[in-house]
């Protein structure tokens, strides 16, 4: 029996175009050898997804120019280009020509990776753009900005002519839902003002600030009443202002060591504002520096009750043993706890002597401990096993406790498992799961 191309027989061209649009262009071109019908299908796909490394030098320019010139009236929904910026740093005018072209042809997805150019003004008034991702580009202060359909925006290592240029780009996107910012240049205070934003992620770490010689701290202003998910990884806060913002449902925050000093009234005010703001979250992730800051705060003022918090994730080292019970005491309804242990050397403090958090007695049901450090075959003097012992001995309603760890050798697993499973359990219904990998 002859092999038949059922896809070609059953599907119309426009469906095939949509299928190929989901592929990188180099893979889309390969379909031209399938049959006579497939030979030119890729040329009518309404988009490009190209990596400069797939071309000889200057080959990319010719390919894109030919593709865009095939039918200048056809729609182009997608333009994704990844460059070696060092080779294409002089090609800014050419790239801007391509952007100008697709803006007039209904582009919805624009991705520019590693081409150090300034965006053309046409992009600021694109009525069809839905997704925008920019890496290592420059943005001037446009005369006017209107992005009425833009829903997601990713800005990575983007240079702005002024703080107002960034603020305007965000505030002029009336349906923006997802915003990701990683490294922005020439911006000292990041202002996020949006009535529709529900997910905000920002990552500005120490090495990023080091490149900005005149910048040592970042200020952050958030005015987003519908925000539901917040992920902040910021090395140094200069100030934090929260306007018209409901407490989000999910918060993930990482800061640098010693960022908030309870003796300093200014940093204390910022910390007080932030803690009050996140006290109604249901899902919270903290690094150990955040835990230290909250512990220091609790020595001056009582922590608020995190009554809605049901899931907590903490990245910790041995010094956090004394801090964890203090924070858990403010989480009376916690149901799920994840602990990432990065240092297994046991602190001199005996965690078993700490105040008993209410959640251990009435609500905590699921605990997972991840060990990223190598542990030995003995349970003595190790953070992970001390935590297991503490939780099993004090959690009255816990159902599952899982420990994921790394061992030097497979023979150590049985010894360690035997000792852990011998720990006394307050909850008779608790199941203990041990998952190990080997160095």
From Swiss-Prot:
Q: Which InterPro entries match?
A: F-box-like_dom_sf, F-box_dom, FBD, FBL13/AtMIF1-like, LRR_dom_sf, LRR_FXL15/At3g58940/PEG3-like
The LRR repeats are found at 99-125, 131-157, 158-183, 207-234, 263-288, 313-341
- Keywords of this entry: Leucine-rich repeat, Repeat
Q: Name one Pfam family in it.
A: F-box
Q: What SUPFAM superfamilies does the record point to?
A: F-box domain, RNI-like
Record bears the keyword Repeat = yes
Keyword Nucleotide-binding among record annotations: no
Against PANTHER family, the record matches this protein to:
F-BOX/RNI SUPERFAMILY PROTEIN-RELATED (PTHR31900), FBD DOMAIN-CONTAINING PROTEIN (PTHR31900:SF25)
Q: What is the protein's name according to its record?
A: Putative F-box/FBD/LRR-repeat protein At1g78840
